[in-house]
Amino acid sequence: QQSKPEDLLKLRQGLMQTLKSQWVPIAGFAAGKADLPADAAQRAENMAMVAKLAPIGWAKGTEALPNGETKPEAFGSKSAEFLEGWKALATESTKLAAAAKAGPDALKAQAAATGKVCKACHEEFKQD
């Protein structure tokens, strides 16, 4: 049975909340605003897993739903680029997990790279 568009919208909203909950403590540390999360490596691994699963939440048919925050191009003319953004996030999050295991300086450096991937996708595909 195919998922209803409304269910996919809820799924993607949940996936984005999960990413945020895992990322914010790491980003706070990287910015010097919070202590190093003891579970930083696990958080980064969780982010990579979510990034690999996330595209299922952006299936065609969900682009016009109310409360969707994604620009229509992500579903159409730029869908390949949008999917590449998720792949990039999965890659950078995997690197982030390795960096967390290597130490605080490595984590800070990789957090900057991971954050750039997030920012680029939001700038390109998130509605204002």
Curated annotation (Swiss-Prot):
An example molecular function term from Gene Ontology annotations: electron transfer activity
Keywords on record: Electron transport, Heme, Iron, Metal-binding, Transport
PROSITE patterns hit by this protein: CYTCII
Gene3D superfamilies according to UniProt: Cytochrome c/b562
Cellular component, GO, one term: periplasmic space
Domain of life (superkingdom): Bacteria
Complex formation: Homodimer.
Function: Cytochrome c' is the most widely occurring bacterial c-type cytochrome. Cytochromes c' are high-spin proteins and the heme has no sixth ligand. Their exact function is not known.
The name this protein goes by in its record: Cytochrome c'
